[in-house]
Amino acid sequence: GSSMSYKAYPFFRDILINECIYFASKNKKLVRLNYKSEAYVGVWTEESVAVSFLTSRDIPFDKVVKMDVDRFATYELDELFDEQDHIIMNQTMEEEGHLLNVVAVTQEVMTELDKIRIKEFVQDVAKYDEVYGLTKKGSKQFILISENDSDEKKPHIMPVWSIKNRALKVRDEDFEECDLITIEGSVFGEWLDELRDDHKAVAIDLKTGVVGTIVSAQKLSNELTF
């Protein structure tokens, strides 16, 4: 594999900002585009660009599907693609688009998003001195969950939020049996030490559907400034 970085491309920044990508589907299959006389699945960072391109080229499609990039990385990537598969990013009337290894580009995007989110979380907590988490009724501890609902592993990930409305949304959609509570930064720091000693992990500002950035307690505690 090449050590080519995708960071310099405009699409990379678009995905970091909007956290979503677009595919076109026809008869429940992903639409493929021609690129140097081969056909690859087309991906776009803007819905309107996808629609106008497909329409102008008379490429048949039923709909353009918006996909959250965390959900894509967590659930769809392995379902839809093999290790060596390539996609065409942002093909338009003017541009032939970029041929990308889908696994490599997804990994690089998610690595970058993780870095950004860890930094923002640490800054928010340092500034507002509040960490939100979920508790089972009557408990004072934040809950632990497993990755991707897998029951094989004991729950080892503590979901925490610095963004209250996102925490509430996830509570309402995915954990309605739980209460949302808040603790001070210093208390979180102590809990993090315990998690680190137990080799556990932390999920930072998870989205609904329980997807997002999961990081070892060790790594997060290295980043803390409070």
Residue positions per predicted region:
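Conserved NAD+-utilizing ADP-ribose enzyme module
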Residues: 1-226
